[in-house]
């Protein structure tokens, strides 16, 4: 795996998961929909791109957690400022 791929896994995907958590909350009006989509997408990518390597399950959990945290934070901030 190249250096660019590692940087994208460590920095790129978490940023995308966070942005998707925020956008998903505004689009779907539920805090759990975006993390669920991130989880399903990450699992599909784990099986297809990483050939089912179970060591990448850590990243699947991290991306889902990041999406969940940003979605819940957006929920609380939205209620706080309304």
Swiss-Prot record:
Protein name: Uncharacterized protein YycQ
Main location: membrane
Localization in the cell: Cell membrane
Keyword Transmembrane: yes
Sorted UniProt keywords: Cell membrane, Membrane, Transmembrane, Transmembrane helix
Gene Ontology CC entries for this record: plasma membrane
Organism: Bacillus subtilis (strain 168)
Transmembrane segments: 4-26, 31-50, 55-77
Gene name, Swiss-Prot/TrEMBL: yycQ
Domain of life: Bacteria
């Amino acid at each position: 795996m190249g250096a660019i791929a590692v940087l994208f896994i460590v920095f790129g995907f978490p940023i995308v998961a966070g942005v998707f958590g925020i956008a998903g909350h505004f689009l779907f009006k539920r805090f759990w929909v975006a993390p669920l989509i991130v989880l399903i997408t990450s699992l599909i990518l784990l099986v297809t791109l990483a050939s089912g390597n179970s060591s990448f399950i850590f990243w699947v959990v991290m991306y889902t957690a990041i999406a969940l945290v940003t979605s819940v934070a957006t929920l609380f901030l939205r209620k706080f400022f309304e």
